[in-house]
Curated annotation (Swiss-Prot), chain A:
The gene is ASK12. The lineage of its organism: Eukaryota, Viridiplantae, Streptophyta, Embryophyta, Tracheophyta. Keywords: Nucleus, Ubl conjugation pathway. It comes from Arabidopsis thaliana. GO terms for cellular component: nucleus; SCF ubiquitin ligase complex. Belongs to the SKP1 family. This is SKP1-like protein 12. Part of a SCF (SKP1-cullin-F-box) protein ligase complex. Interacts with ADO3/FKF1, COI1/FBL2, EBF1/FBL6, PP2B10, At3g61590 and At5g49610. Involved in ubiquitination and subsequent proteasomal degradation of target proteins. Together with CUL1, RBX1 and a F-box protein, it forms a SCF E3 ubiquitin ligase complex. The functional specificity of this complex depends on the type of F-box protein. In the SCF complex, it serves as an adapter that links the F-box protein to CUL1. Plays a role during early flowers reproductive development. It is found in: Nucleus.
Length: 152, 447
């Protein structure tokens, strides 16, 4: 039984053939399919090939059916491995998941970044993400005082 | 600016990321840089514990936050009274406010300041188009004053929640939740209101997972429970208090976790042959769940079934491919009788309890001679947990399975004492002397 395929085109001109059922996990793509404008392939101006490859990998894994019966426990383990990426890739994935409207991927990527912030001091967070502190010491102190409780 | 990619995300996505954090972590980001100073304020989430605030001014913080975001929607409100505070009845008011702002996730854990005093949730939790998950712990809920309407609610967790006197409260709530998938009900031991909710009926066309805990605390027979859920896939039944138990339409049931004595202590007093009513209850319960594929069963449940099986045979669990059971020393024979009801079992996990407080009325069987069907044709993997090598029961079991399982591929032994690390070779040597009916069987030892 052959399944319907559609073509996704990355911003840097690469084409990827994907099963329609897998691709429509993206609400954005699902709407385009409904509106029937996919004949020549779907151009994804905001997603470069390196990221689109990861997105397709995710969607394939999450397309659970008889051919791919996978338990929630196994999916969670897979998620961990999948998200073992460079920071810049993770942020690109957030942008892609947002643009393509793939809720579960968006949740996963945001949660991954949130976990990198959780429990850290501001200094540690700045260091993790290379954020420059443009407060003067007095300004920073004033901001801390606003919510003293969080910094104790 | 040398900032890594995170700064290239627009504000809207940064606030999204912050919404996955407890509020205390979100607030900390206010000092990261000027760009971050006010991002946390725009996060439509409050996720706090009272213990986050050393001087207990959580109330003014929450008030200020809600006031600042007066015009926006709230996605999640989570508040835990995890520490003693002067109870000031603020929780209900905050719930009213957040529900009015289109909340999707509401999670409130109250504090019992003294017996018979609880904070009760407002009526508007019964009418909310946006609520997707509701978790309430150690609070009270009132009788609904109107028809319950929670059209988006998928997850409901009620733990140690008090009710007033409406005997139909649970039915009213559930019938107002047409898409409810996941329900956890941990019933309180409410000594102030012992006769509340005597008849619990859980009837739902959408429910896929249900966990019920009702721990035995009163010697009586007036509690009963009925579960009617044709889409139910997972049932965790830990109700020890209900005397009448009816389970029906379990056509989708795939997994059951059962830990209950069916109130046999007092409702059936040792299950005398004359107690037909209890026998019928247990028979109907087992028949209703007989399509399960995966079962976890506790020791005391097995003991009740053992007593019961002397009156009427246990129905066959034809689809059961995976069984996890806890047994004690005197229960090995009982286990084999139960296994006879599982003719297609492939996977067996046993936990061995050495503590044995039940006095066996039967003479100790020296050898386990009986071999159930599944060992001859389907059982491929056996795992024995909390095993102490050198201890008689464990060894008996290991010998038994190796000797009698025709198609066994794996025997996994999880050892209790980690001190035997260097005795692995001794164990292996000894094991290799045991008779193995399945030549290709692999024995794996895990500490």
């Amino acid at each position: 039984m052959s399944s319907k395929m559609i073509v996704l085109m990355s911003s840097d001109g690469q084409s990827f053939e994907v099963e329609e059922a897998v691709a429509i996990q993206s609400q954005t793509i699902a709407h385009m399919v409904e509106d029937d404008c996919v004949a020549d392939g779907i151009p994804l101006a905001n997603v470069e090939s390196k990221i689109l490859v990861k997105v397709i990998e995710y969607c394939k894994k999450y397309h659970v059916d008889e051919a791919n019966p996978i338990s929630e426990e196994d999916l969670n383990k897979w998620d961990e491995k999948f998200m073992d990426l460079e920071q810049s890739t993770i942020f690109e994935l957030i942008l892609a998941a947002n643009y393509l409207n793939i809720k579960s991927l968006f949740d996963l990527t945001c949660q991954t970044v949130a976990d990198m912030i959780k429990g850290k001091t501001p200094e540690e967070i700045r260091s993790t993400f290379n954020i420059e502190n443009d407060f003067t010491p007095e300004e920073e102190e004033a901001v801390r005082k606003e919510n003293q409780w969080a910094f104790e | 600016m040398n900032c890594d990619r995170i700064c290239e995300l627009p504000d809207s996505l940064l606030t999204q990321v912050l919404s996955y954090l407890p509020t205390i972590d979100s607030v900390k980001t206010s000092v990261l840089s000027k760009r971050w100073e006010f991002l946390w304020l725009r996060v439509p989430v409050l996720d706090l514990k009272v213990s986050d605030f050393p001087d207990e001014n959580y109330a003014s913080f929450i008030d200020n936050f809600l006031e600042f975001n007066r015009k926006s929607r709230m996605r999640k409100f989570k508040l835990k009274y995890d520490e003693y505070t002067y109870d000031d009845d603020r929780l209900a008011g905050w719930v009213v406010t957040t529900v009015d702002r289109g909340i999707q996730h509401l999670d409130a854990k109250g504090f019992e300041t003294n017996m018979c005093v609880r904070e009760f949730m407002p009526q508007n939790i019964y009418k909310c188009n946006t609520l997707v998950s509701l978790m309430l712990v150690t609070v009270g809920i009132e009788n609904p004053e109107f028809v319950v309407s929670l059209p988006s609610l998928k997850i409901m967790h009620l733990e140690d929640v008090w009710y007033y006197d409406d005997p139909l409260i649970m039915e009213k709530i559930i019938s107002g939740c047409p898409v409810l998938e996941d329900f956890v009900l941990i019933r309180p031991i409410d000594f102030c209101n012992l006769d509340v909710l005597q008849f619990l009926r859980v009837r739902s066309l959408s429910l896929r997972s249900f966990r019920l805990t009702f721990e035995y605390s009163v010697s009586c027979t007036y509690f009963s429970v009925e579960i009617d859920a044709p889409r139910l896939e997972y049932l965790n039944f830990n109700d020890d208090q209900s005397d009448t138990i009816v389970v029906k339409n379990m056509t989708s049931l795939s997994m059951i976790d059962i830990d209950s004595e069916f109130n046999v202590k007092f409702g059936g007093s040792r299950l005398e042959p004359g107690d037909l009513r209890k026998r019928d209850i247990i028979r109907d319960f087992l028949t209703a769940i007989s399509c399960v594929r995966h079962m976890i069963i506790s020791r005391r449940t097995l003991e009740v079934l053992d007593r019961y099986s002397k009156l009427v045979p246990i129905p066959k669990f034809d689809n059961l491919y995976r069984l996890q059971a806890a047994v004690s020393r005197s229960m090995l024979q009982l286990l084999l009788v139960f296994l006879e009801s599982c003719p297609n079992l492939e996977n067996l996990i046993l936990r061995v309890h050495l503590q044995d407080f039940t006095v066996s009325t039967e003479p100790e069987q020296d050898g386990l001679t009986y071999v159930p069907q599944c060992l001859l044709s389907s059982l491929e993997c056996v795992e024995i947990r909390e095993l102490i090598m050198g201890e008689e029961t464990g060894e008996k079991l290991v010998r038994y399975f190796l000797k009698n399982s025709v198609v066994l591929k794996k025997l996994i032994l999880r050892l209790e004492d980690s001190s035997i690390a260097n005795q692995d070779s001794d164990i292996f040597k000894e094991l290799s002397t045991f008779t193995k009916r399945s030549r290709s069987c692999e024995v794996i030892i895990i500490h």
